[in-house]
Amino acid sequence: MNRVSPDPGMHPRPGRSRRGSLRQRLRNVCTRRRIVIAGALLLGAAVLALLVPQAWYFHQVRQLAEHNPDSTAFMDLRRAQDGGTNIDFRWVDYTEIAPGLRRAVVAAEDGGFMAHNGFEWAAMGEAWRDWREADRPLRGASTISQQLAKNLFLSEERSLRRKLQEAAITWMLESQLDKRRILELYLNVIEWGDGVFGAEAAAQRFYGVRASELDTWQAAVLAARIPRPRYYHRHGETTFLIRRAARIEQWAAHARIP
């Protein structure tokens, strides 16, 4: 009886099978390693894209402790929007701004200025709920520090992304500058009318006096202009503006300032 010899190709040798399995495992390891490296690179790029702008903003804020700004994002925006509108911007020191104007602005825009760390959380919560529940644009509820962040570096866009960037810059301002410097910057760079930026330019444009010479009523009217400076420049002292100024003049007597 003849024995049939087994075909060598039917049963691979154990050594060859183990080598093939090892190569496959090595391929899998290399593939996973490439995926991990690619993911790490993408994550690193994303983190870098977030951190580089923040580092730039932080450097700019640190500079503001010692140097007065020559211009702001809002001034540049007005120049671009209005075809080269002449910007009336005259810097004055904090002590050259009438105490009545300092008090009126704090009373009108941010009564808790001296107490908070840059944010009024209750007001921000209400604005957030309005945005989420009613699909409305993100509304104000901004402190003086938040308004300063926006005026110096950002735009008028009302979006979540811009609000988050505003919050980051606000934290930088509050951590690097004292309240007096923040208020000094604010009073010098905010818009008071068409192309009119800062308390000195506003006092001279609307009342023909220096910022240090404003009386309490003039200060209250200027503070009342802040939410809609260009509108009031074009329409003058409306009934609503006068009524609001009267309330601000009363509130200002109790406002805390640096």
Functional labels for PLM-detected ranges:
Residues N2-P258:
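Juxtamembrane regions of bacterial inner-membrane/periplasmic proteins
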